[in-house]
Amino acid sequence: MTMINSIINISLNKISKTHQINKFKNENNFYNNNLKCSDLDVDFRHQTIIGNIHLGNKGILAGIYYNI
């Protein structure tokens, strides 16, 4: 059970860091109207968290990928 709790705690920490990155970019004036953040895809089986940032009319897809 401790192992499972550790995985969940680490995962939540990574989600928090991803949201901080997205918040920073959303507050940046240059990205303010173009940045759209998708929902995070959390996969506990492979213990990875994937978050995607879409820059609307720029046609750019940037991925944030964390290995736990």
Curated annotation (Swiss-Prot):
Top-rank lineage group of the source organism: Eukaryota
Query: What is the designated name of this protein?
Result: Putative uncharacterized protein DDB_G0293256
